[in-house]
Amino acid sequence: MLKIDHLVKNYNTFSLDCSLEVLPGQITGLVGKNGAGKSTIFHAVLGLIRPDSGKITVLGKDSQEITAKDKQKLGAALSDSGFSGNLTIQDIISVLEKLYDDFNKNFFMKQVEIFGLPYKKKLKDFSTGMKAKLKVLIAISHQAKLLLLDEPTAGLDVVARNEVLDLIRDYMAEDEERAVLISSHISSDLESLCDDFYMLKDGKIIFHEETDVLLDQY
């Protein structure tokens, strides 16, 4: 579903060099402190930055060959980007209907109601929890095959965090071929969700293990 082979990206004060794989039907966790390189990986996979070297395979294709139609199968929630704070959910629905052929408006509106998200309120007036729920909801609203979720639970209280994680579980339960790469700087946030973990430190993968094995050992 996603394979990264020796992805290298160099900055003045930071260098990333990592490899990882996300298999169909699995939720893979990427854990590391802030500044470890998690967001750089997500940006590279989505084509938002150009790696210095390495290969990224997404949905079975080289990332350089991904088409606009292929990108419709990707769902992303990034920690450092999103819709303008001046938009409302009503505005966002209009955008999503134009962006994605498979946008499920009925599902989206149902979840908005369940989460109690204000339909006509500007995003800049949303709480942190509301913004987090909306980001993940947008990512899963168009039948994506691969979800890329960068710190979706950051800053959330226990109730809001569990609601976001349940949304991801429900998404995976609908299709066994789907996959998720999700990052956090706190491993305990993801222990009940992920099938396996990668630990990232200073731009390098220092640890990879299946969650069941990890919990048995520690």
Residue spans for each PLM region:
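Helix N-cap at the start of a conserved alpha-helix in ABC-type nucleotide-binding domains
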Residues: 36, 158-160
